[in-house]
């Protein structure tokens, strides 16, 4: 039986014999050969390696690298390798050019209508009827000044020019947004690091710097950034479903299947691999390339053609695509992101699986509101056109009895075009295109600022969803506590030491067991390094619990590194790595005499149950009976736990040389009959700022629950220190076992009614598995106990937390302690792992909601007034007092600028003083409705007074009933100017939506707001004074300006009057903007949702989706929505995010398919799914045990089959900061 020690001896010469490739000679293996090798599987690959290279060390020799020392790190050598084998980077799809974005913006239905109308108007304006026919054709140019008749073309030209401005602004918005997304994307990529060995040193380098020949260390939770071949492994199991579609975890070993592929997840174990392919040459890169090449064609083809195309592809690729469809993770792997990722099979995926997540609260409400406004606008514009046409026809041909003359036809058509333009103007005004822009700006602004608050938002909508959070299920370690662990108590040689004992107090043989057991039975990647600054604390690298144990040895004046030098990792005979099911780790050593010794460490109650002996005060082993164990639990473990300490038991077992060798793959038979060495108590202090943060959450109506793997007494003590539990309160603390027993029926099935009896009072879930966390989150979300559906946020750091993170409305992954898999499944990454950052996310989320409401209050006031003025003015005077060009200015510029001004208000602590809005609370409250109607009333009175009596007051000519191409009138200019200034001052009123009186409070904290208000005012002066005919404006005098400003400022005084009226008295006021209820959506619309909302656009075209149902269906306009079409949005897969307003972050690059993983969790079936494990039943023993462990005790098979349809961020701010 060979073991790894033999391997390391046999090849110990390799590292010395290999020199770095600094000369110009070629490598002994080509890129093509490596690619061909990595396409083989298991035994085929093994045979090829043996036939062509001897073994993996032969490949290392040809790649001029050392399996122990790695590459030297010489820059010239690294450059040469990149030149020969490529960079670890997949080039993203080219961004759309500015001209492409302009063309997209031109596709807007309303703009097209306006363009056609303007062109017709322009063409007809050059027609003059024959002399003498003017009188017969009606008043076309009567009363015009000399030469004015020839300027009829200006209005058409001005509309065209306005459309050009709109298109350019829209395209520029798209372009800048895309640029911003790409910047965020590159930031993520730069911050993503992986552990490699260079020059004998273990270092972390950016994923993009990994090159062929690097020796990479892989561990539980990693997402592999490149293809490689295993050099050494401990119980390594990989989830390859992202490439193969096979959900069972694949065991990797030197003698069975040594190939490791990029984009796959390490679900268990650890090891080292030599990198053999990177970037576009890796298996995932090859798929990306194929998808990228076919991406544009596929977009144009329908489903059937796509299916045929897929059938034609060769087996391997078909297999990979299938895998992608099933899992979605392949394309999302964070290290190698590319926009091509999710395009190919997205539609197939979404049809196969309905979305698991509902649309976000805000998106649902906005969608419904948009539909209502769109329908109302369409109706008003249609009625306006019909009334104008009928009035003109009846007046001209019926009342005046004029004949229809052929030469007058162009004149009549000009009238009809004018009426049509007025109708379109009403529609333009009615639909608040600024709304999607406000949503985008608000979320984008928030996301940017949240980075400073240590929240890296991967899915835009998660930011807004956090504002509605009603429950947070938080981990304990590192989130509520500092994750700096130290051993502070110990039970050794039958004595309970309240502080770390002196080494002299411990019998030498017990000390020897302790030192060897801790040194070899902690991951070799866990270590304690000297402090970075003088006088600082030593740096803990790797698993923090293991670092506490290594620190314990240093306190005992022993050096773990000496033991590791003597017993290198390659010499470990067998390792049962830690996972969330085992809650322990065991390492087997083979002694020179042929005997074996196993060291185990883990949760004290678990390891103690396996102990049959204990080391006594004199260092001898004595029998350890159940009652002795109960005594230790009562006198040692419970007192430690009640002080908030985590207890770890250390034990060992000897296998004498004469006895038959055990069946190493049967862990239950191996890790039993142990001898207890010691029990240690590890302290992890509560973060000092956490109790105050939890108090804020509770005040804000958010319930905080702790979900931890620690023992229940430790968990209860920490929960009390944090303020989650208070003395005398009637709340539940349950262990995972007890929780499962209470929520399952006699058949072992989970029942929602049972969960509903528990979760409202549950505050602490201890000794819980990731499955328990997922069950709890799902139970709370699916519950119907409360009126409102709960909105749940969850924190997670482990590989198996993925399902819970995905199921939650918002998943938070730990940026420091979190695994790649957890980060990939999350919506927000906490870059400081701190609970207080979650509270900041709540503040920002609520602020987004408020920002949208502020904008709505402002926008709807503008819309109500403008529509009524345009409609009534058109019907009474046959002309809109507000011209098309003026309305485009009000609509585009003021909407855009107002959305920027109101959407960038910073959050305040007062946001945490009220309860969550809830899923059914309308966007427009009764107070807001009071403000909208109140201000609209004031503005309408002012506008109509000016319209019908203004000429007398100012002693000027009336602008009413002007002929077709009349010059601009002072009268209508005053109406327009006053209208705009009223909006400007009302923007200040709109800053407050909860009835506050001081609308100026904090106004100077928002420089953007002040700049925009002043800037808009300056532009308005220019338009009025110098706009002339194109803007239908006439210069105004100082007096007229002062009156306009006075009437505008009146809105501030009127606002004070409105705020004094109690809303409760106004019973007639209704709320608006409720969320869409499920029963309101017809089935075909649901199907449409799957089509539209689950697609890649979900992520990127969040704004468009907002309006899809309503406005797209009734073919009305939404011009700024197209601004959301940035190329990032195109063809992106949906990030995990909830379906919510726009995933800022979602570049395909940042994305992960959000669909819910199919986990054979025990809540789905009574027994655990062991079919897969039977299929993979352990093979006959092989010489190298180190690579062949199978956890046959418990099979936790997690299929990461992510349905494409759930939301997922592929990743742009799939999204954003720490190493994703």
UniProtKB/Swiss-Prot annotation:
The UniProt keywords, alphabetically, are: Acetylation, ATP-binding, Calcium, Calcium transport, Calmodulin-binding, Cell membrane, Cell projection, Cytoplasmic vesicle, Ion transport, Magnesium, Membrane, Metal-binding, Nucleotide-binding, Phosphoprotein, Synapse, Translocase, Transmembrane, Transmembrane helix, Transport
Reading the lineage from the top rank, the first entry is: Eukaryota
Give positions of region: Calmodulin-binding subdomain A. Answer: 1100-1117
**Where does the entry say this protein is expressed, by tissue?**
Expressed in the retina, with strongest expression in the outer plexiform layer and lower expression levels in the inner nuclear layer and the inner plexiform layer. Specifically expressed in the following retinal cell types: photoreceptor cells, cone bipolar cells and horizontal cells. Expressed in osteoclasts (at protein level). Expressed at highest levels in brain, intestine, kidney, and stomach, and at lower levels in liver, lung, aorta, portal vein, urinary bladder, diaphragm, seminal vesicles and testes. Expressed in small intestinal epithelium.
Q: What's the top EC group for this one?
A: translocase
Give a yes or no for keyword Magnesium in this entry. Answer: yes
Residues assigned to the Extracellular compartment are 127-154, 387-418, 877-882, 949-971, 1028-1039
Q: Where is this region: Disordered?
A: 297-356, 1160-1220
Gene Ontology cellular component annotations, sorted alphabetically: basolateral plasma membrane; cell projection; glutamatergic synapse; immunological synapse; nucleoplasm; photoreceptor ribbon synapse; plasma membrane; presynaptic membrane
**Location of region: Required for basolateral membrane targeting:** 1118-1220
Composition bias, Basic and acidic residues = 312-325, 337-356
Q: Which residues carry this modification: N-acetylglycine?
A: 2
For binding Mg(2+), which residues are annotated in this chain's numbering? 475, 477, 797
EC number(s) recorded for this UniProt protein: 7.2.2.10
**Job of this protein:** Catalyzes the hydrolysis of ATP coupled with the transport of calcium from the cytoplasm to the extracellular space thereby maintaining intracellular calcium homeostasis. Plays a role in blood pressure regulation through regulation of intracellular calcium concentration and nitric oxide production leading to regulation of vascular smooth muscle cells vasoconstriction. Positively regulates bone mineralization through absorption of calcium from the intestine.
| Family statement drawn from the similarity comment of this UniProt entry | Belongs to the cation transport ATPase (P-type) (TC 3.A.3) family. Type IIB subfamily.
PANTHER family found in the cross-reference section? CATION TRANSPORTING ATPASE (PTHR24093), PLASMA MEMBRANE CALCIUM-TRANSPORTING ATPASE 1 (PTHR24093:SF245)
Protein name stated in the entry = Plasma membrane calcium-transporting ATPase 1
Report which gene this protein is encoded by: Atp2b1
């Amino acid at each position: 039986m060979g073991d790894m020690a033999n391997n390391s001896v046999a090849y110990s010469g390799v590292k010395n014999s290999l020199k770095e490739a600094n000369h110009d000679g070629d490598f002994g293996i080509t890129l093509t050969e490596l690619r061909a090798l990595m396409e083989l599987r298991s035994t085929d690959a093994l045979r090829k390696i043996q036939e062509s290279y001897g073994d993996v060390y032969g490949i290392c020799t040809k790649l001029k690298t050392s399996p122990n020392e790695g590459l030297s790190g010489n820059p010239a050598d690294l450059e040469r390798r990149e030149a020969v084998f490529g960079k670890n980077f997949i080039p993203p799809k080219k961004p759309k050019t500015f001209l492409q974005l302009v063309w997209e913006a031109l596709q807007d239905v309303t703009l097209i209508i306006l363009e056609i109308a303007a062109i017709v108007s322009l063409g007809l304006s050059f027609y003059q009827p024959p002399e003498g026919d003017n009188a017969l054709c009606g008043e076309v140019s009567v009363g015009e000044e000399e030469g004015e008749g020839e300027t009829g073309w200006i209005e058409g030209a001005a509309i065209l020019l306005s459309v050009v401005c709109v298109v350019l602004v829209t395209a520029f918005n798209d372009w800048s947004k895309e640029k911003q997304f790409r910047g965020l994307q590159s930031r993520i990529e730069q911050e993503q690091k992986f552990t490699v060995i260079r020059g004998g040193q273990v270092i972390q380098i950016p994923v993009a710097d990994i090159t062929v020949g690097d020796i990479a260390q892989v561990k539980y939770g990693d997402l592999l950034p490149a293809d490689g071949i295993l050099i050494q492994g401990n119980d390594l199991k990989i989830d390859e479903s992202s490439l193969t579609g096979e959900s069972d975890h694949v065991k990797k070993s030197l003698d069975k299947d040594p190939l490791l592929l990029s984009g796959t997840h390490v679900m268990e174990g650890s090891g080292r691999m030599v990198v053999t392919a990177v970037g576009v040459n890796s298996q995932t890169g090859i798929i990306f390339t194929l998808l990228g090449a076919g991406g544009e064609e596929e977009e144009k083809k329908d489903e059937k053609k796509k299916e045929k195309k897929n059938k034609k592809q060769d087996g391997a690729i078909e297999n990979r695509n299938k895998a992608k469809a099933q899992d979605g993770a392949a394309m999302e792997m964070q290290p190698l992101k590319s926009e091509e990722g999710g395009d190919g099979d997205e539609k197939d995926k979404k049809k196969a699986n309905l979305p698991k997540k509902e649309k976000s609260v805000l998106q649902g409400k906005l969608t419904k509101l948009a539909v209502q406004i769109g329908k109302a606008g369409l109706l008003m514009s249609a009625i306006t056109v019909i009334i104008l046409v009928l009035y003109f026809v009846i007046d001209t041909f019926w009342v005046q009895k004029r004949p229809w003359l052929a030469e007058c036809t162009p004149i009549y058509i000009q009238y009809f075009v004018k009426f049509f333009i007025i109708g379109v103007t009403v529609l333009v005004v009615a639909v608040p295109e600024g709304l999607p822009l406000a949503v985008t700006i608000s979320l984008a602004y928030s996301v940017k600022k949240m980075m400073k608050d240590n929240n890296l938002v991967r899915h835009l909508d998660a930011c807004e969803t956090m504002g509605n959070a009603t429950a947070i299920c938080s981990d304990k370690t590192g989130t509520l506590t500092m994750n700096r662990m130290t051993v502070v108590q110990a039970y050794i040689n039958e004595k309970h030491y309240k502080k770390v004992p002196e080494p002299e107090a411990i019998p030498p043989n017990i000390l020897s067991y302790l030192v060897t057991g801790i040194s070899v039975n902690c991951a070799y990647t866990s270590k304690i390094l000297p402090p970075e600054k003088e006088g600082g604390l030593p740096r803990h690298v790797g698993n923090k619990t293991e670092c506490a144990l290594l620190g314990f040895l240093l306190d005992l004046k022993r050096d773990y590194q000496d033991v590791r030098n003597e017993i290198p990792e390659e010499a470990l005979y067998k390792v049962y790595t830690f996972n969330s099911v085992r809650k322990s780790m065991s390492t087997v050593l083979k002694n020179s005499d042929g005997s074996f010794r196993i060291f185990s460490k883990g949760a004290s109650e678990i390891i103690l149950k396996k102990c049959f002996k204990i080391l006594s005060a004199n260092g001898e082993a004595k029998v350890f009976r159940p009652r002795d164990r109960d005594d230790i639990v009562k006198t040692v473990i419970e007192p430690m736990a009640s002080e908030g300490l985590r207890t770890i038991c250390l034990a060992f077992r000897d296998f004498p040389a004469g006895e038959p060798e055990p069946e190493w793959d049967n862990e239950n038979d191996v890790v039993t009959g142990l001898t207890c060495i010691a029990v240690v108590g590890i302290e992890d202090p509560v973060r000092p700022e956490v109790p105050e943060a939890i108090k804020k959450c509770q005040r804000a109506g958010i319930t905080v629950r702790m979900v931890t793997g620690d023992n229940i007494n430790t968990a209860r003590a920490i929960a009390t220190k944090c303020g989650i539990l208070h003395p005398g309160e009637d709340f539940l603390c349950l262990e995972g076992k007890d929780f499962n027993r209470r929520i399952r029926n006699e058949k072992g099935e989970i029942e929602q009614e049972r969960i509903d009896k528990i979760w409202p009072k549950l505050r602490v879930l201890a000794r819980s598995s990731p499955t328990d966390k997922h069950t709890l989150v799902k139970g709370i979300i699916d519950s119907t106990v409360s009126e409102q559906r709960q909105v749940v946020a969850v924190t997670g750091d482990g590989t198996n937390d993925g399902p819970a993170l995905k199921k939650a409305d918002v998943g938070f992954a730990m940026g420091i302690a979190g695994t790649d898999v957890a980060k990939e499944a999350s919506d927000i990454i906490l870059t400081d792992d701190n609970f207080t950052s979650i509270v900041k996310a709540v503040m920002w989320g609520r602020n987004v909601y408020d920002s949208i409401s502020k904008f709505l209050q402002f926008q709807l006031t503008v819309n109500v007034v403008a529509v009524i003025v345009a409609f009534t003015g058109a019907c009474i005077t046959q002309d809109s007092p507000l011209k098309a060009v003026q309305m485009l200015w009000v609509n585009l510029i003021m909407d855009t600028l107002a959305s920027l001004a109101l959407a960038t208000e910073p959050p305040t602590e007062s946001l945490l003083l009220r309860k969550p809005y809830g899923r059914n609370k309308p966007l427009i409250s009764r107070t807001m409705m009071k403000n909208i109607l109140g201000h609209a009333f004031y503005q309408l009175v002012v506008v109509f007074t000016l319209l019908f009596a203004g000429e007398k007051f100012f002693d000027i000519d009336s602008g009413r009933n002007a002929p077709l191409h009349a010059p601009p009138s002072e009268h209508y200019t005053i109406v327009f100017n006053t209208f705009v200034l009223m909006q400007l001052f009302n923007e200040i009123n709109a800053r407050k939506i909860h009835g506050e009186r001081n609308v100026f409070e904090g106004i100077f904290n928002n420089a953007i707001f002040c700049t925009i208000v002043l800037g808009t005012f300056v532009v308005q002066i220019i338009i009025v004074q110098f706009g002339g005919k194109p803007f239908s404006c006439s210069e105004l005098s100082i007096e007229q300006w002062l009156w306009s400003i006075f009437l505008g400022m009146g809105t501030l005084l009127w606002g004070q009057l409105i705020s004094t009226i109690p809303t409760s008295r106004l019973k007639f006021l209704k709320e608006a903007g409720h969320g869409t209820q499920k029963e309101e959506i017809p089935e075909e619309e649901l199907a449409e949702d799957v089509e539209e909302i689950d697609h890649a656009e979900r992520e990127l075209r969040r704004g468009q989706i907002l309006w899809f149902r309503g406005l797209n269906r009734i073919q009305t306009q939404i011009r700024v929505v197209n601004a959301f079409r940035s190329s990032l949005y195109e063809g992106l897969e949906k990030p995990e995010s909830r379906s919510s307003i726009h995933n800022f972050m979602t570049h395909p690059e940042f994305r992960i398919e959000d669909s819910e993983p199919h986990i054979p969790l025990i809540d789905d079936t009574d027994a655990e799914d062991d079919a897969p494990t039977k299929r993979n039943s352990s093979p006959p023993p092989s010489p190298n045990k180190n690579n062949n462990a199978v956890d046959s005790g418990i099979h936790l098979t997690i299929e990461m089959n992510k349905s494409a349809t759930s939301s997922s961020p592929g990743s742009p701010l799939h999204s954003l900061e720490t190493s994703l």
